[in-house]
Each structure stands twice: as structure tokens, then as C-alpha cells.
């Protein structure tokens, strides 16, 4: 989000001002500049993912989570620093990010929505393809049992780094679209609150699944809106109680629990239908009473 905001606010306007029609027309030039910015966002996301992977490659479990949270908090503090106020806006952030007319949410909100929706669908298909690839299957197996993967000749650290970079790239693009929608980039985007919200959505939907976090995000945001309307300022307390209940009774999330129980549910329906069919045949086979 900040890489996109910094480039669009500080570099892109100056470049287009000095080269208004470098590719023949101002509109084509603005699209080309936007593509360059997207490419830089991709490179920055890869670099951040590698940084996190290299600094936490030897850690597991709680220590791994603590270090990644500490690194994100360090970035949050750096961005809020008053020494970088001229570039990052410090506490205020970057507001009024200049965007092309067709990508401006204040004037073409529906267009931006469908572009974002298209990106979500493409991302899901790409990640589905990646998970089903040989590398993706090794990453999944590495998540389940690192020691076993090491015994059969794979380096868990390498595949964990690949997973980190892939996740960082898609998170970077998600941040870019979030900054486009709000036309701003603020420190809260990389704060611990944002991290916790993402974890809540993932846990509610189902960890270890691709469709789960999507359902979790939709359900979480919808519930939060209703709870805010019904309970006002007390909605976080009610939402917290609901989240605890979900963790207790749906420990694998909504999608994860459904997948685990799908066979039992299907078998239950078969038994129920068989019971109804048997009863219907028995009723049909009974002779009418004699008069």
C-alpha cells in the first residue's frame, strides 16, 4: 500500500509533468506509468517477503509468529516516524493519492469494484494452480511435517521462503487495491490490528484452505456491520464472544469443518432418505382393511 502510495503521490505526477505524452498521448502515458508502479509494488513485495523469510527461517511455532509480528511492528514504527513525515505522512499517512479517472473510486466506484473482484478471482485461480503444483504440494506437506520432509531430502527452509514470498506478493497487491479504494495509505494498514483482523477472517473461514479466508472475510465484515448497528460501541465485545464460540465448536473454521464432516453429512442424508423410502414402501404394501 505504501509503495503504491509513495510512487503515485511523489514520482508519477512529476514524471508525467516532465513527460506528458512520452508514449504518444497523455492517457497512454498514464497507463504505462501505472503499470510501472504495479511492477515496483511486485518487486517490493518480493523483497519484503524475502526479508521476513530470511530473518525467521530457523524458527518455528510461537517464536516464528512472534518474530514476524515484531518485524511488522518495526515497519509500522518506521512509517509513523516524524523523520519521514515528508514521504510517509507519519501518523496522518498519505491522503489524496492521484489516480487515473477510470481508477478513481469517487467517480467510477463500480468500475473499481469489478476490477478488484476480477483480481480476487484471478488470484484464487493462480493460488489454486500453485497449491496443486509439485512445489505447492511440497509446501503443504512441509506445513504438516517438516521433519519428514527433511528426511526424504527436501529443505523445509527453502519451501517456507517460497511460501513467504508468494504470500507477500498477494498481500502487497491486496494492500495496493485497498489504498486505491481509500485513495490513501495510513499506518493502520500495517498495524497489529490489521494483522489480527486478517487472522480472525482466516480462522473463521478455515486455515489451510483457499476459499475459507474469502468466506471468513465476507462473514466477518457482515457480522461486524450488523453488530455495530445493533450494539453500538459494545460490538467488539459481542463479536469477541462469537469468535470464541466459533473457535470452540468449529476449530477448523467453517470451510475446514464442512470438509471434515462432509462425509458424515452425506452418509446421514443417505440414511435419512433410505429410511423414508423404506417407510413409503411399507405403507404402500399394506392391504386396505376389509369392510
Describe each model-derived feature in a short phrase.
Residues 1-291:
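Transmembrane alpha-helices and adjacent helix-loop boundaries
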Amino acid at each position: 500500500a505504501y509503495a503504491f502510495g509513495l510512487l503515485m503521490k511523489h514520482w508519477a505526477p512529476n514524471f508525467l509533468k516532465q513527460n506528458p505524452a512520452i508514449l504518444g498521448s497523455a492517457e497512454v502515458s498514464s497507463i504505462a506509468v501505472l503499470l510501472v508502479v504495479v511492477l515496483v509494488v511486485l518487486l517490493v513485495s518480493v523483497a519484503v517477503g524475502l526479508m521476513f523469510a530470511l530473518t525467521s527461517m530457523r524458527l518455528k511455532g510461537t517464536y516464528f509468529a512472534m518474530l514476524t509480528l515484531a518485524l511488522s511492528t518495526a515497519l509500522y514504527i518506521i512509517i509513523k516516524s516524524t523523520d519521514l513525515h515528508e514521504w510517509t505522512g507519519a501518523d496522518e499517512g498519505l491522503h489524496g493519492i492521484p489516480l487515473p479517472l477510470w481508477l478513481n473510486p469517487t467517480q467510477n466506484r463500480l468500475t473499481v469494484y469489478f476490477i478488484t473482484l476480477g483480481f480476487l478471482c484471478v488470484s484464487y485461480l493462480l493460488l489454486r494452480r500453485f497449491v496443486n503444483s509439485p512445489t505447492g504440494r511440497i509446501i503443504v506437506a512441509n506445513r504438516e511435517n517438516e521433519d519428514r520432509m527433511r528426511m526424504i531430502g527436501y529443505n523445509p527452509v527453502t519451501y517456507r521462503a517460497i511460501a513467504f514470498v508468494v504470500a507477500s506478493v498477494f498481500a502487497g497487491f491486496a494492500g495496493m487495491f485497498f489504498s486505491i479504494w481509500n485513495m490513501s495509505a495510513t499506518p493502520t494498514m500495517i498495524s497489529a490490528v490489521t494483522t489480527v483482523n486478517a487472522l480472525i477472517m482466516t480462522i473463521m473461514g478455515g486455515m489451510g484452505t483457499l476459499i475459507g479466508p474469502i468466506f471468513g472475510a465476507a462473514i466477518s465484515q457482515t457480522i461486524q456491520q450488523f453488530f455495530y448497528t445493533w450494539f453500538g460501541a459494545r460490538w467488539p465485545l459481542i463479536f469477541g464472544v462469537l469468535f470464541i464460540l466459533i473457535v470452540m465448536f468449529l476449530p477448523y473454521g467453517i470451510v475446514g469443518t464442512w470438509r471434515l464432516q462432509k462425509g458424515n453429512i452425506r452418509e446421514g442424508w443417505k440414511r435419512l432418505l433410505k429410511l423414508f423410502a423404506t417407510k413409503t414402501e411399507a405403507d404402500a404394501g399394506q392391504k386396505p382393511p376389509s369392510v
